[in-house]
């Protein structure tokens, strides 16, 4: 099984996960990469993705698995067919369920003053409030925050749970901004993923 690491930046960060699946399928077809198809009445490419990210979050660490054989220049062939903001940057061979195994992600958060308040998320029983399906929800998310550190006054780095126990980084940012009266826009960049505490690229390179 091939595992490909790819980016979703600029306009590609505004593409929903289901449309990303369609885009990757199209890219594989255009690049003439021979991927196995599912059996049944509605066959589709056997692709598996790491946990999806919310719209507007840029990423340089997305992963997709494909039941395909290794080919020469496969990254170049794929990248020749990618839309702006999407590119394939690394290739691995490993049989793995990406969504279940890559269960943490690192993000760079950028917003006015967020570096000065990021330490707050490390408080015991840290609770955030957000709106879900028009209902205000409060949850203790402390068990899903693995690290948080200041980069400078206006940026910070966090490692959060993803996958089955996903914690959306935009909810952390918006809660901090609301609680601390921070104004302005914010930006989030996903920089890497982990299999527990092992960086994804290192894990996928292991025999």
Predicted feature locations:
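Short amphipathic alpha-helices in soluble, non-transmembrane regions
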Residues: 74-83, 117-125, 172-174
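A short, aromatic/hydrophobic, helix- or strand-capping loop or linear motif
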Residues: 35-42, 89-93, 128-134, 184-186
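Core RNA-modification/binding signature centered on pseudouridine synthases
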Residues: 123-207
């Amino acid at each position: 099984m091939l595992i490909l690491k790819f980016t979703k930046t600029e306009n590609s960060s505004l593409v929903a996960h289901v449309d990303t699946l369609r885009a990757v399928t199209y890219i594989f077809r255009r690049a003439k990469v021979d991927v196995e198809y599912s059996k049944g009445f509605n066959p589709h490419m056997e692709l598996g993705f790491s946990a999806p990210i919310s719209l507007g979050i840029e990423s340089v660490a997305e992963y997709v698995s494909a039941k395909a054989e290794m080919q020469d220049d496969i990254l170049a062939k794929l990248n020749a067919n990618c839309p702006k903001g999407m590119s394939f940057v690394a290739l691995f061979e490993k049989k793995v369920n990406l969504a279940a195994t890559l269960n943490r992600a690192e993000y760079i958060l950028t917003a006015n003053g967020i570096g000065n308040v990021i330490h707050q998320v490390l408080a015991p029983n840290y609770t955030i409030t957000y709106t879900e399906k028009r209902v205000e929800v409060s949850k203790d998310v402390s068990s899903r925050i693995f690290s948080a550190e200041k980069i400078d006054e206006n940026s910070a780095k966090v490692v959060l749970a993803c996958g089955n126990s996903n914690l959306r980084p935009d909810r952390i940012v918006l809660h901090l901004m609301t609680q601390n009266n921070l104004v302005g826009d914010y930006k989030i960049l996903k920089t890497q993923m982990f299999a527990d505490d092992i960086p994804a690229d290192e894990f996928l390179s292991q025999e």
